[in-house]
Amino acid sequence: MSFNTFGHLFRVTTWGESHGPALGATVDGCPPGVPITEEALQVWLDKRKPGQNKFTTQRREPDAVEILSGVFEGQSTGSPIQLMIRNADQRSKDYGDIAEKFRPGHADITYWQKYGIRDYRGGGRSSARETAARVAAGGVARAALGALVPDLRITGYMTQMGPHGIDRARFDWEQIDQNPFWTPDAAAAEDWAAYLDGLRKAGSSVGAVIEVTARGVPVGLGAPIYAKLDTDLAAAMMSINAVKAVEIGEGMAAASLTGEANADEIFMGGDGPEYSSNHAGGILGGISTGQDVVVRFAVKPTSSILTTRQTITKSGAPAEIITKGRHDPCVGIRAVPVAEAMMACVLLDHLLLHRGQVGDGPRGAIG
């Protein structure tokens, strides 16, 4: 199985399975001298780890990260950073009934058809458990970004659960960390709690929309055509489990606008060019404008539900299946820190590419 690595100069390779002894990431390309500690990385992993409330899977994993290489006396050395997270709460017996069956909506059938072998215990490599390694790697990227671009801030949040969206008029950055859904709308969080609790008790699930905003992004990240910043951001988000659609800025809604409505008009401000709006999501021609970079994606409902469904076995015989085990009723909740991590990795990668090509700062002066 190939394609376990992403990135150009800042490269991340993840490894491990849901029910294996451990999983982790090898991070190559982190600049030397970046302050990195296990404690600092753990902050981000704690945001993602399961079992923290009734709205996420009750699998109890400490998700304690171990730095095995690439860091000396609290600083990166420039060599590959090996990160490991041991699995502690596997319950493989829950999956014995599906060893010969394919779960609808999961990667079971495509993995089997492509490779002729699959780890049915929790999905193996296709499990969202793999994203713990991404969050650890994202912590490294955040540390490097913090050293290179101190004012850059990456924040993910949920804007929709099932058919229920937030009220943008109530958007409050301070609310995001105050509820289990990472939403900026406190009233929506209360409504979603009752809604999701009902689905959880019924053994069902629901999808969600997640938005990630990076504030303080320098001008000039990305390149035309095949190295667009939005190309890599879209690919990064689409690689997250259960993601089925990605938008940049106004996204699909831009198709219903006129040219006048969609135009981000440009004015000269005291510190340089300013824009009347941000329909472009902070990226023009694949290159960052200095505005907020805004990415949005949709995740499908968790496929592991307690409803009896029709499927087939490896031999092609019809069968019924109920997915046992411990699962998230809304994977969008824990997708938030994963999306933040992927955004951090892509932005650092493009910052390093930009500095390597043109040096620090934009080349074309205005004013």
Swiss-Prot record:
A matching Pfam family: Chorismate_synt
Residues that hold NADP(+) according to the record: 48
Gene3D superfamilies per UniProt: Chorismate synthase AroC
Metal-binding found in the keyword field: no
Cofactor details (free text): Reduced FMN (FMNH(2)).
Listed EC numbers: 4.2.3.5
Catalytic activity: 5-O-(1-carboxyvinyl)-3-phosphoshikimate = chorismate + phosphate
Cofactor(s) needed by this chain: FMNH2
Positions that bind FMN: 125-127, 241-242, 285, 300-304, 326
Classification via CDD domains: Chorismate_synthase (cd07304)
UniProt pathway: Metabolic intermediate biosynthesis; chorismate biosynthesis; chorismate from D-erythrose 4-phosphate and phosphoenolpyruvate: step 7/7
GO MF terms, alphabetically ordered: chorismate synthase activity; FMN binding
EC class name: lyase
Oligomeric and partner information: Homotetramer.
HAMAP family in alphabetical order: Chorismate_synth
Function: This reaction introduces a second double bond into the aromatic ring system.
Record NCBIfam families: aroC (TIGR00033), PRK05382.1 (NF003793)
The protein's name in its UniProt record: Chorismate synthase
Record organism: Dinoroseobacter shibae (strain DSM 16493 / NCIMB 14021 / DFL 12)
